[in-house]
Amino acid sequence: KPGYEYPIYRLPEELAPDLAWCLPTHSCPEEAFLQVIKPEDPYYSRAAIDLDGALKNRNLEMAWLGHPVETYDLMLEGSGILAFDDGTQQAALFAGLNGHSGQSMAGYLIRSGELPRSKASMKGIRRWWDSHPQKRRAFLNASSGYVFFRFGAEHPKGTAGCELTPWVSMAVDPRVLPLG
């Protein structure tokens, strides 16, 4: 549909974890997934997926968003609620990763001198993205991690396992900021 040209993808079958591996002592499917995709064996990079169309024509598209920065933000958050034109809503939940490392778009733009910290808001990042098409691949190569999603009936949950609250909850890396 015009205006919605940027897909989010479900987890490709070749990346699906072997859930038979899961035992009660492991959380699933994330830990099982980590057994499938190892850093030495990464899947397509973000640039290959977003710019080169590595997943096109595979019927993996779950939904189409209006701007590539919106897809990046959803991946950064790890899950979210999609609002469709017909008024329905659907949870897009974390399903897996491509095995590459990722980084904050704001952090990258600040460190590379592209944006001052004062302008590194989502609005500022979107403005930068729209006005620098020739620099997009450099960012996507620097942050090549990719998040795949699944539809779910449950409300999105954060790292601590609690339901997320709109405008209150935020994404954190427990290696940097302890939970709780």
Question: Locations of the language-model features?
Answer:
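Secretory/export targeting leaders with adjacent low-complexity proregions
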Residues: 1-152, 158-162
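C-terminal soluble interaction/assembly domains
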Residues: 153-179
